[in-house]
């Protein structure tokens, strides 16, 4: 037994474990490249392609929905047909190709009339390149994000039948999410600054370089990866034989769907308003206490990330220990309580944004020419980060504990499905609002529109969502955690 354990340890030290940093670094660089494009994309579409605000927002919502939905498809393909390594390699290469196509749109000069010197905002070729970028990066995300974390966990196993210790998995997950958050921080600060200061060509070029490095790092360690064989013929289509266990798994999934659906509005309130916030920040006073320095419009989302991280640290390291000491017994908020608190805070969050937009528009239309400070966006960012920290982690704990162990991979992808559904619903709401208000709420010049009315509509939906969650909680009954 000791010789077998020693052999297993040697196998992991030679092959699997040393490759984990390559996988995590590759994943972090993919996130850096992708999220570095997101904040300013609304400006790129409206300025370089001459799109209206509503049209550009709809395109970005659909792109976000596809990017968050395809990982579920990728997970099914990897588990049933291809295995994880080929799918990650394919997804990374496809994403890189898409980003190169986007970068090419910044090189192609617009067609200009020599007499009038009037230039067309876009051409057919540039439009084809743009939409190809959206399609390829969405498909690529399905390959990379569906399998990267699971493939890293595979490196802790010398063979397909061995088990991974809980402490090893916890360490891996901690490093994974830490690397992702660092990538998000850098993308919304460094990359957005480069785009704002040096232009689209250099800014998008940095994302291409980061994605190219991601692909290179992933394939660099390919001879040393632990790779499990793809499923056999008998296991390729397991749903052809509908066993009792599979029926029970399906019942468990159906039971948690109502609770899952309550998270859609929260994602709509926090993550789906990034594009509009960039447009707001662009028209506000972004000066800081550092003389001569302005925060780029696309970088304000970084405050939501900081709020998320700070609240998590404060909750785990200060609030819980202090309350446990005061009560003289272990203190812990249940998942349902944390979800409810997240939904209540989301109402305050979007209300703060609506009030800020009302004040911003009123100040902008004032003939004095003054601008409202962009720091008034911080209440929305801070409350949004707290709401996400409370709700997202609680939902993940709930799904992981309530669904059978055979559905652990499904449990970890439900959060991304929330974002996909929220992006689709956002697109529908924007379309309906734009049609019913005859374009008077969401306009190309937001000073002339009523973006605050749109936000108050989201406040109403958030209030209804709180009531809906209470009903779902009562219907579900008592959960195991």
UniProtKB/Swiss-Prot annotation:
Xref: InterPro entries: MFS_trans_sf, POT_fam
Localization of this protein: Membrane
Tree of life domain: Eukaryota
TM stretches of this protein: 32-52, 57-77, 88-108, 124-144, 173-193, 202-222, 259-279, 302-322, 333-353, 374-394, 422-442, 451-471
GO molecular function: transmembrane transporter activity
Cellular-component GO terms for this entry: membrane
Pfam families in UniProt: PTR2 (PF00854)
Tissue-by-tissue expression: Expressed in roots.
Record-linked Gene3D superfamilies: MFS general substrate transporter like domains
Keyword terms: Membrane, Transmembrane, Transmembrane helix, Transport
UniProt membrane topology term: Multi-pass membrane protein
Entry's family note: Belongs to the major facilitator superfamily. Proton-dependent oligopeptide transporter (POT/PTR) (TC 2.A.17) family.
Protein name (record): Protein NRT1/ PTR FAMILY 1.3
Taxonomy of the source species: Eukaryota, Viridiplantae, Streptophyta, Embryophyta, Tracheophyta
């Amino acid at each position: 037994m000791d010789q077998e354990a020693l052999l297993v340890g040697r196998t992991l030290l030679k092959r699997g474990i040393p490759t984990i940093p390559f996988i995590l670094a590759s994943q972090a660089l993919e996130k850096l490249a992708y999220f570095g494009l997101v904040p300013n994309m609304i400006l790129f579409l409206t300025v370089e392609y001459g799109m209206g605000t509503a049209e550009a927002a709809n395109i970005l919502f659909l792109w976000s929905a596809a990017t968050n939905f395809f990982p579920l498809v990728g997970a099914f393909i990897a588990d049933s047909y291809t295995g994880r390594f080929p799918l990650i390699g394919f997804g990374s290469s496809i994403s890189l190709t898409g980003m190169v196509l986007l970068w090419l749109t910044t090189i192609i000069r617009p067609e200009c009339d020599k007499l009038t010197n009037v230039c067309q905002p876009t051409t057919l070729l540039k439009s084809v390149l743009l939409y190809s970028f959206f399609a390829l990066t969405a498909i690529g995300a399905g390959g990379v994000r569906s399998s990267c974390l699971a493939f890293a966990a595979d490196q802790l196993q010398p063979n397909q039948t061995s088990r991974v210790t809980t402490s090893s998995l916890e360490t891996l997950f901690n490093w994974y999410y830490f690397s992702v958050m660092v990538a998000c921080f850098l993308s919304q600060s460094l990359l957005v600054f480069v785009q704002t200061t040096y232009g689209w060509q250099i800014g998008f070029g940095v994302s291409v370089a980061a994605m190219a490095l991601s692909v290179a790092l992933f394939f660099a360690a390919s001879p040393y990866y632990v790779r499990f064989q793809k499923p056999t013929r008998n296991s390729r289509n397991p749903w052809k034989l509908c066993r009792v266990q599979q029926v029970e798994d399906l019942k468990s999934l159906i039971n948690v769907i109502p609770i899952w659906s309550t998270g859609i509005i929260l994602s709509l309130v926090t993550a789906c308003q990034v594009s509009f916030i960039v447009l707001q920040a662009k028209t506000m006073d972004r000066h800081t206490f550092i003389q001569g320095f302005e925060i780029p419009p696309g970088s304000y989302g970084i405050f939501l990330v900081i709020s998320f991280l700070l609240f998590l640290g404060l909750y785990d390291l200060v609030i819980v220990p202090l309350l446990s000491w005061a009560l003289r017994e272990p203190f812990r908020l249940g998942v349902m309580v944390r979800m409810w608190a997240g939904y209540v805070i989301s109402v305050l969050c979007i209300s703060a944004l609506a009030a800020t937009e009302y004040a911003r528009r009123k100040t902008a239309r004032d003939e004095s020419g003054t601008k409202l400070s962009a720091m008034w966006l911080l209440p929305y960012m801070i409350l949004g980060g707290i709401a996400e920290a409370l709700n997202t982690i609680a939902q993940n704990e709930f799904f992981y504990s309530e669904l059978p162990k055979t559905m652990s991979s499904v449990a970890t992808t439900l959060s991304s499905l929330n974002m996909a559904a929220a992006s689709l619903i956002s697109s529908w709401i924007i379309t309906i609002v734009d049609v019913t208000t005859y374009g008077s709420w969401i306009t190309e010049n937001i000073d002339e529109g009523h973006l605050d009315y749109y936000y108050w509509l989201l406040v109403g939906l958030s209030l209804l969502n709180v009531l809906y969650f209470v009903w779902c909680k009562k219907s579900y009954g008592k959960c195991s955690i």
